[in-house]
Amino acid sequence: MKPAFFAALASAFLVTGQAMAAPPSPTVSGFWQQADDDGHVGAWFYFVLRDGVYEGRLVKMFKPPGDEAPISTCSKCEGDQKDAPMMGLTIIKGMHRNGTKYDEGSILDPRDGTVYHAQMELAPDGQKLSVRGYVGVPLLGKTQVWTRLPDDAIAPADLPKESLGPDAAPPPTPAPAKTAAVKPPKGQKPPAIPK
């Protein structure tokens, strides 16, 4: 009887010790870079956990090569986002986390004000994020792969004040970045960030 009891007790300590030693799985919290299919960086986003769901806010835009300056307000948006400044605008809303997958959310295209269903999936190492916007069913949509940026990509003082919001949780300690500090792509200059 005693050997079985001690074996069970040792197993319990072993399992508990392994669970306590496992690092937390990464989340989408933090900075992300979005690029188009040609590799031109379009924007940086900041994800936070708010009221139990994740949202992503626009924190930096880049001028596309050969295009005019990026739009400054969401003139085609509806509701409380109508004519809101682009910097700090919530583009992705209501994302519920289930492991590395996020769903039940929406994504806004600020160019035309259209809101699409959205789902996301975080790579196991936490450095890539597949973002899919769709109409009706996920099969009818488009996916972009975003890249995680270092936590110090933008100093907190330089973030649009709307980016964090009053009840946003600070991002957890991120997974270690595998790249050096990210600079704007060659030939692109970031616009001045309003304070």
Describe these PLM feature segments.
Residues 1-7:
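Bacterial N-terminal signal peptides that target proteins for export
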Residues 7-16:
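Bacterial N-terminal signal peptides
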Residues 20-29:
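N-terminal helix-cap/turn-to-beta initiation motif at the start of protein domains
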Residues 21, 154-195:
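Compositionally biased, proline/threonine/alanine/serine-rich low-complexity intrinsically disordered stretches
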Residues 31, 53, 126-128:
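Structural motif
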Residues 34, 40-119, 159, 183-195:
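Central antiparallel beta-sheet cores of small beta-barrel/beta-sandwich binding domains
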Residues 100-151:
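Surface-exposed interaction patches
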